Amino acid sequence: MIPVEALTPFEARIEHAELVETIARWDEAYHAKDAPEVPDDVYDGAKRRLARIEGRFPELAAKSPIRDKVGAAPSEGFGKLVHAVPMLSLDNAFAPEDVAEFDAKVRRFLGLGDEAPLAYVAEPKIDGLSINLRYEGGRFVSAATRGDGAEGEDVTRNLETFPATQLPRTLGPDAPAVIEIRGEVYMTKADFLALNQRQEAAGEKLFANPRNAAAGSLRQLDPKVTASRPLSLFAYAMGEASAPPAASHWEYLERLKAWGFVVNPLIRRCDGVAGLLSAYESLGEARATLAYDIDGIVYKVDDIELQRRLGFVSRSPRWAIAHKFPAEQATTLLEAIDIQVGRTGALTPVARLTPVNVGGVVVSNATLHNEDEIARKDVRIGDTVIVQRAGDVIPQIVGVVPGKPRGAVPFVYPETCPVCGAHAVRPEGEVIRRCTGGLTCEAQAKERLKHFVSRNAFDIEGLGEKNIEFLWEKGWVRGPADIFRLKARNDAELLQRLENFEGWGKRSTEKLFESIKTRSAMGLERFIFALGIRQIGEATAKRLARHYGSFGAWRAAMLAGTEEARAELTSIEDIGPSVAGDLLDFFSEEHNVQAVDDLVAAMAALDGAVEDAKVIESSASPVAGKAVVFTGTLVTMTRPEAKARAEALGAKVVGSVSKKTDYVVVGADAGSKAAEAVKLGIATLSEQEWLALTGAAD
């Protein structure tokens, strides 16, 4: 694999798109299906390489639909519970330098010097399923999985099967009126082996690893199944609390123990980077002897007030990080190389392997990245290959064991699409070959439809991949608008009505049509994401929706064709020339505009519409939706802290002053931005005036 530092812009752009698509697929398998396709450290490695590429090429950051994403949408088999405080994931560290950089970032954000005391808590990172337990008036009332971070699955009845020694039903009189306690449901190694022995004896499917077994056991529609499984629970974090139960995380853990929760006995309190690395080394040495699986150690700033000040960025807290353990390797046989065609036409090679256990997880597929990598490593069908679960690279075949089998020939990369037969071209300087068939390519068209109905797009219940394939083969659905005309078409049929086909039935067909009608009203950000425009992920779609506000305004801006419209587009956070180019190119094609308008019309025919973007209203914040510029040196907070607070109130913090700026907050030694604000007649505020406006003044 080419080192990130050596990637050309073309190579970075193509690998970035490949990483985004791969990670999104893994997220769905891991969080929604409890069937991880790759080991955790392979996944972490892909995320880390993605972050390194985005760090070197910042303009690519907006191309990540998984950038701000946590988990996956809750399963439709369970009710949903909204998390009052989002359940976010953690950034990762893989080397001592990463830990030192984490500590340095915390200190910079808080304005602390290198020698200032800063305490942390180091906790084993349990490999299980995260859970949120809500108590009101000291009594257990509900439990939810992480889900997509904003809302999770209601598994209250399943948690009620846990013994009181694992899950206290009541807390002490000192508990806040409302408190959410977070932890990890896991399965010990011994219990996992015993469960699989019972599964095998009963002729049932075996679980791949303890984490998968724990997740599958907890997410059962029948609580009796959960009760029959040997699950355990460690408590370690806090969600919503009506009053702070402790001043530090360490004190909070002590409070959890007093309330009857099991807290991991290996948790340590540490000072500075040296203390964190010492805890990491000690835990790494003990890892093999533990009764349960861990995949790293989590470091948290101990002081809860400092945690509050540090806040969150994107999908993770600034005050915590996960330090992961190193990679593992195994050898296996490469049985075949398949070429997959994605919705953007990218031809991606996938290695089909004889299943092999790599560090406790069965791996049967691995990416081969692109044709250059296949040629560079001289990977051939029939080779014995080295599969790596890696800490800093994408899941991959890292090498070939010497001694190729007789008759093995070099792999010839196709120059035509394996699905539609159209030319597959590779522009000069790029590493990805793409099908030129566009929407005439069945693979691309079907993949776009699957994307359109997916959980984070239109999320149409009853219209999964299998049913999309069926409707495509029947010729009833060839584009998004056809979905919203499906009932009318079905009603007009005399013989081939949907409910008459095997696997459908009257009730399931009615439910599908009800779901389609419900989804005929859709928020702008999901609508934009669902279109499947290249490089437009969930995060970018959300920024576009919030910026333009309505479908009409967004459509008009995309079709304006003026330099002013392009400049406005690139002024949006994380949208650079490349992303803007793909957006405008999409709308420059008349058939795309027609398809979008046709979709909106079909939605309207069912009394639906594309709904305007919701304006963030944080406690009726007076700055919600306002564009704010900070300039000069601030006194009461650091610049990153000011930005984080403003965004938490719904403001849009921008880096330059323009006619669209609402406020310029002027600190000491302000430069040209303050002068530009005066010139344009934009309101300027002192730091104290800003604090007074936002209700943060003393």
Curated annotation (Swiss-Prot):
- What's any one GO cellular component for it? cytosol
Give the enzyme's EC designation: 6.5.1.2
| Top-level taxonomic group | Bacteria
Catalytic activity annotated for this protein?
NAD(+) + (deoxyribonucleotide)n-3'-hydroxyl + 5'-phospho-(deoxyribonucleotide)m = (deoxyribonucleotide)n+m + AMP + beta-nicotinamide D-nucleotide
EC class: ligase
Q: Which residues does the entry assign to the active site, renumbered to this chain?
A: K125
UniProt keyword Oxidoreductase, yes or no: no
* InterPro entries noted in UniProt: BRCT_dom, BRCT_dom_sf, DisA/LigA_HHH, DNA_ligase, DNA_ligase_AS, DNA_ligase_CS, DNAligase_adenylation, DNAligase_N
Positions of disulphide bridges: none
Q: Under the GO molecular function aspect, what terms does this record hold?
A: DNA binding; DNA ligase (NAD+) activity; metal ion binding
Q: Which cofactor does it need?
A: Mg(2+); Mn(2+)
Q: Which UniProt keywords apply?
A: DNA damage, DNA repair, DNA replication, Ligase, Magnesium, Manganese, Metal-binding, NAD, Zinc
Q: Which GO terms describe its biological process?
A: DNA repair; DNA replication
Question: Which Pfam families did the record assign?
Answer: BRCT, DNA_ligase_aden, DNA_ligase_OB, DNA_ligase_ZBD, HHH_2
Checking PANTHER family in the record gives:
CHROMOSOME TRANSMISSION FIDELITY FACTOR 18, DNA LIGASE
HAMAP family xrefs: DNA_ligase_A
Family indicated by similarity: Belongs to the NAD-dependent DNA ligase family. LigA subfamily.
Biological role stated in the UniProt entry: DNA ligase that catalyzes the formation of phosphodiester linkages between 5'-phosphoryl and 3'-hydroxyl groups in double-stranded DNA using NAD as a coenzyme and as the energy source for the reaction. It is essential for DNA replication and repair of damaged DNA.
- What is the protein name stated in its UniProt record? DNA ligase
